[in-house]
Curated annotation (Swiss-Prot):
Gene name, Swiss-Prot/TrEMBL: clpX
Annotated residues for binding of Zn(2+): 27, 30, 49, 52
Function (record text): ATP-dependent specificity component of the Clp protease. It directs the protease to specific substrates. Can perform chaperone functions in the absence of ClpP.
Protein name as annotated: ATP-dependent Clp protease ATP-binding subunit ClpX
Protein species of origin: Chlorobium luteolum (strain DSM 273 / BCRC 81028 / 2530) (Pelodictyon luteolum)
GO molecular function: ATP binding; ATP hydrolysis activity; ATP-dependent protein folding chaperone; protein dimerization activity; unfolded protein binding; zinc ion binding
Keywords attached to this entry: ATP-binding, Chaperone, Metal-binding, Nucleotide-binding, Zinc
Amino acid sequence: MTRERETAKGKTRNINRGGDGGEQVYCSFCGRSAQEVSSMVAGPMAFICDRCIKTSYDILRKELSAIQHPEVIAEQPFLPRLVSPKAILESLNQYVVGQERAKRSLAVAVYNHYKRIDSQEWRHDDDEIVIEKSNIMLIGPTGTGKTLLAQTLANLLEVPFSIVDATSLTEAGYVGDDVETILARLLHASDFNLERAERGIIYVDEIDKIARKSANVSITRDVSGEGVQQALLKILEGAVVGVPPKGGRKHPEQQLININTKNILFICGGAFEGLDRLIARRISKSSMGFGSSVTDKQSGYDPEILKHVTQDDLHEYGLIPEFIGRLPVLSTLDPLDADALRSILVEPKNALVKQYGKLFEMDGVELEFTPEALERVVAIAIERGTGARALRSVLENVMIDIMFELPTMKGVGKCIITEEVIDRKGEPIYLDGAGRKKKRA
């Protein structure tokens, strides 16, 4: 179904969704296909969808209104919710167990970041004080909640959020993802709402993996280490970057969308294995007893040592000074002990035990874990050494067979998981609606 009309420069076509399927076109501005939008207008050399037309109209209307009626205040742009540090901390406490120092640091940093954005909208030209952006570096072992902290912050502030693995990034021209891919993912997360994307949060995981491989200059390029750090500098600090909406290398012919990164908050996280030894060596120069006691430890992390991390330590680890300087807020996370893992299982709003309980409730069954079962889950997770991630792995391995059988079992009102079930040495206890034991058929 097409409808043609004459224009001054030639023919345009209005391509309505639901045509005969013989023509596949994409918006030259946002990259959406004709099937994803209500209408697509085709010009001699380009296409534009109805959503981009509306966005363009809104922009032009505001600009014309400002010129013709300067006394009229323009419509307020999208601004994230400005939440106080205490409110941010209270929200984080509902989902993240422990890590009080890191949560406080994040709460203040995020509050100041979005307060800075808010002040920019009403800043006078004669105001000489310009508040710089403060991106965040989270340092802590695997499974301590770095990603969860960033995700929870984005949900609280109602801003777009995306996660990227730093190990997939390489310099432009090499196999892997360009750094612009980071912004493309945020653009998708915002449903191509540019104004929202420019105030979103990006979490870059495994940032320690792009540390320089060696302190010595090599004749071969370090395309996934220092090269990526150099490529990330401009988007971390704030620049207008041309972003390919479908990804950079598979569709080189596509139109670029310009994103200004000056108000995007970047949170980088990494385990930084071995960093504690670098810190201990530095400290031991002035306090031999303290330093030697740390380096004698066989376990990787000492939380007390990590609290003393400095930018110089990160430089020695392999991050370049320019990159470190663009992540001024440093916060460390502690390894999770047995008490913390036990709390993670049952206390947060989205605790694993509560999630499984909800799934069983949908089948009309009450789920219960005995205290001994929970202790056994924690013990196995500690043995695996991957923090909170191990909890889900242990439970999923145990629960999958139970959840496979349960929907076809009749008359079950309650399912009790014991320590023997966790160790795969016994069956769950099934009770009927009256509380009587029920054997599995």
